[in-house]
């Protein structure tokens, strides 16, 4: 579990207080490992029997985090309006209590199919809670840590718990994925898993396995219950603890954003795909930044950036590995500032040097958890960590403004 996080007085920066709360909910997830393992066992049995695996939510971020993801399952597919489910299938359904009526309606449709539903989210509010959970076969509950919370965290997000709950949902999703993979190894199967496509050679490696749910041959031994999911939670907790040391950099970036806005300029944000891109405008987001067009990959839309940037504006680049040299050059031509959040590679970055830097502290190649006998690590870190940085920055801007 590591050292206890500080939940004390408000002399800590907002970034540290928010990360303390997030570390606490991730650590709380470890207490659910027996339930996670049990759910993984049930789903593994269904997959071996030929059932398909889907992921569903009324929010696009939870689904996007799960599919075609570094360290994730190749067999996992997004559930949509045209999806036909059978009783042998499994659906991972995520919610965050931001749209309970829509959640219940979608969950009802999943239940009507007869598919096995793994629910990931906080306890539903109000009198419909019992009916809601009756539609779920396995419930992996997320919730903020019990009081005392670090002071002022939820308040900076307008009272919304989403910036904490949604990221605990991801910790549960990936711990569950790890325990399901381990349960499959105890049945002689190794699921095909993605490597980050931005690692050299990964696209070719992934293409060899993409049409297979399981490896035709593998050297992965049966893995004990609790090992893979538990290791992931340890590793992602370590990433967040390391990120906590970036709190001064987070505060510098947030103050720069506040100063830019205070003089009438804009903060233009490029947020990397999968989960982080959907945090702009999510429940609790004060929308202090203007988001650039949603795109895949690591390259901001240069034409849009050229059109938007004005002297004194700030470009907030929440990226993946690499520095977008051409985008930075466009910002400099416009007389703008640059704040950079990338993991980096072994190579020296190209392009202009940014004015502000936050080191996200998640590893190059993204995935955290080794599997004995497998060629790549599994279960990613970047979605949780990069989204946490976004929330830490905008929460600090909100505190500065108050």
Where are these regions (language model features)?
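A short, well-structured juxtamembrane/interface segment
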Residues: 28-46, 242-261
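Glycine-rich phosphate-binding loops that contact phosphosugars or nucleotide phosphates
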Residues: 1, 42, 48-186, 264, ...
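Short secondary-structure boundary/capping elements
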Residues: 10, 35, 249, 297-301
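Generic N-terminal amphipathic, Lys/Arg-enriched alpha-helix
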Residues: 2-31, 211-244
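Flexible, glycine/charged-enriched surface loops at secondary-structure junctions
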Residues: 35-38, 53-57, 184-194, 246-253, ...
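Short, contiguous, pocket-lining structural segments
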Residues: 14, 35-38, 58, 168, ...
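Internal, active-site/partner-interface "lid" segment
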Residues: 24-25, 148, 157, 179-223, ...
